[in-house]
């Protein structure tokens, strides 16, 4: 979901932990909510657990335009391959940050190459 990716990117860039938690929690709650957002009256967005006042305008933007400008800002700050690494099972934003920032690896292909060379063993977050 848009909000899950936004939370992951915020964590990757070490954004405020409370903001990160807000986005990831909202993503989880929205995914578990029985009604699709598109079918809900906008007045009820706040009734979804975990969706606070600050996220409601973003939900409205997303439904009106199909875009989430706040997410797009985070995407612009992040190499495409790093975003792709967030989709690898078992590797969360914290490990991806170490792989990217400390090791200079910016794609799944580079990560595979580093694994084959056993370069990840030396890093606490990866070993």
Where are these regions (language model features)?
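Accessory alpha-helical DNA-binding modules that contact the DNA backbone or grooves
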Residues: 21-126
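Double-stranded DNA-binding cores of transcription factors and transposases
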Residues: 1-34
């Amino acid at each position: 979901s848009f909000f899950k990716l936004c939370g992951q990117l915020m964590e990757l860039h070490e954004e405020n932990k409370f903001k990160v938690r807000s986005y990831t929690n909202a993503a989880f709650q929205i995914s578990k909510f029985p009604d699709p957002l598109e079918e809900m009256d906008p007045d009820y967005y706040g009734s979804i657990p975990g969706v606070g006042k600050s996220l409601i305008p973003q939900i409205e933007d997303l439904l009106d335009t199909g875009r989430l400008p706040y997410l797009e800002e985070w995407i612009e700050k992040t190499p495409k391959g790093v975003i792709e690494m967030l989709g690898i099972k078992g590797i969360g934003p914290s490990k991806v940050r170490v792989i990217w920032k400390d090791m200079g690896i910016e794609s799944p292909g580079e990560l595979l190459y580093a694994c084959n060379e056993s370069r990840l063993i030396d890093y606490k977050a990866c070993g």
